[in-house]
């Protein structure tokens, strides 16, 4: 095995181990924020959604800056410092008893994510061959699902048996371990293959108008995805009346991922373009969300959640691969960072807007309101994507170094 192939293989295993700590730490805390503050403490869904949206907006909105620094300084210092910063954010969240403290914790967690997220994503693109990206993203999705179950089960148990403070401290410990692991084992990889200055990397992205429009359009996709952390857990708790039942959302995701993600991804790679897979998955997600406000049966809710995850299984590997192949190796992290802007906008609107619509629907006794609004947003997103792919010649190209 030549040295380059060996580096790629070892790098792949490193990414999988690192991802395990990060995902478990994330899911041990974030899905329970809405439950703790809305259901247990009685805060409004809008207020909690605003804090979650603020975290999303800062982390992903500043992604292009974090990515540009990673292009210039390398992956390791950005990833390690970002993981430690999120550790501190979770410690502060364990002390949050006012909206101000919650927002401060979310901001610090977001800044940590701004530092570690773009270079981690760029490492995947650097270490995995372009034609293998789709399958590797499928493996990561499968791992995400399994680790999400571990995280949410751990967090739910700690919340039931002890308190939210211990939930946050457990998440902090996991991110601290991830930071130490990266400091110890992550080589000093250079992500970018050119010597562009910080501003030149950002300018290169901003001159690619088609990439910018595509990125902004994906905000609609993330508005729907954000509900996994906000309204789906709340709806599950409303119908079941049991805090412990929230984990079934993520158990459903894990089971479907184990059974379907590899065969669906392999089969769709043979017969469908990336663009078609992205739009088809989004349509399935829309169909699943539409009736959620009307169901009052736990089994019906789980069926709709299952359909939502099937749509995600179809769309997400295609979206990740398409976004990766639209980047330029000369400013890889800058492209990845800017692409996170769609997650920033979509997450902010999905959390704060979803929380506001939930409160409004409850006030008007019209519980279907947020779900109908989500369906409309998703439909508009599909139509805009179709127009771009059909008429604006947005096509992936296999940039490589």
Curated annotation (Swiss-Prot):
GO molecular function: transmembrane transporter activity
Transmembrane segments: 13-33, 34-54, 88-108, 139-159, 164-184, 211-231, 248-268, 275-295, 298-318, 341-361, 366-386
Topology class, membrane: Multi-pass membrane protein
UniProt cross-references to InterPro entries, sorted A to Z: MFS (IPR011701), MFS_dom (IPR020846), MFS_trans_sf (IPR036259), MFS_Transporters (IPR050171), Multidrug-R_MdtH (IPR022855)
SUPFAM superfamilies: MFS general substrate transporter (SSF103473)
A GO CC term attached to the entry: plasma membrane
Listed name of the protein: Multidrug resistance protein MdtH
């Amino acid at each position: 095995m030549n040295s380059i192939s060996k580096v790629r293989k070892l790098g792949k295993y490193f990414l999988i181990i690192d991802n395990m700590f990060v995902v478990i730490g994330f899911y041990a805390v974030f899905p329970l924020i809405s439950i703790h503050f809305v259901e247990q403490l009685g805060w409004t869904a809008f207020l909690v959604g605003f804090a979650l949206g603020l975290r999303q907006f800062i982390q992903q909105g500043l992604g292009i800056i974090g990515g540009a620094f990673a292009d210039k300084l390398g992956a390791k210092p950005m990833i390690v410092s970002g993981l430690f910063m999120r550790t501190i954010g979770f410690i502060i969240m364990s002390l949050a008893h006012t909206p101000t403290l919650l927002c401060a914790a979310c901001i610090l967690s977001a800044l940590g994510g701004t530092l570690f997220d773009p270079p981690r994503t760029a490492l995947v693109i650097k270490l995995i061959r372009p034609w293998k990206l789709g399958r590797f993203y499928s493996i990561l999705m499968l791992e995400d699902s399994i680790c999400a179950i571990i995280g949410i089960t751990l967090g739910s148990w700690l919340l039931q048996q002890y308190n939210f403070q211990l939930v946050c401290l457990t998440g902090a410990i996991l991110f601290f371990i991830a930071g130490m692991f990266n400091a110890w084992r992550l080589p000093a990889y250079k992500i970018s293959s050119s010597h562009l200055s910080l501003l030149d990397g950002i300018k290169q992205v901003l001159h690619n108008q088609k990439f910018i429009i595509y990125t902004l359009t994906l905000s609609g996709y993330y508005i729907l995805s954000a509900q996994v952390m906000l309204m789906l857990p709340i709806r599950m708790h409303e119908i079941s009346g049991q805090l412990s039942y929230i984990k079934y959302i993520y158990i459903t995701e894990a089971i479907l991922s184990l059974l379907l993600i590899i065969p669906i991804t392999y089969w769709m790679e043979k017969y469908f373009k990336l663009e078609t897979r992205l739009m088809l998955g989004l349509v399935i997600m829309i169909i699943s969300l539409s009736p959620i406000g009307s169901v009052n049966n736990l089994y019906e809710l789980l069926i709709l959640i299952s359909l939502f995850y099937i749509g995600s299984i179809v769309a997400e590997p295609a979206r990740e691969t398409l976004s990766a192949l639209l980047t330029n190796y000369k400013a890889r992290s800058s492209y990845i960072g800017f692409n996170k802007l769609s997650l920033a906008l979509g997450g902010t609107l999905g959390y704060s807007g979803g929380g506001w619509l939930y409160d409004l629907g409850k006030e008007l006794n019209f519980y279907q309101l947020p779900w109908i609004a989500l369906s409309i947003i998703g439909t508009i997103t599909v139509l805009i994507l179709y127009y771009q792919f059909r008429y604006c010649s947005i096509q992936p190209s296999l940039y490589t170094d």
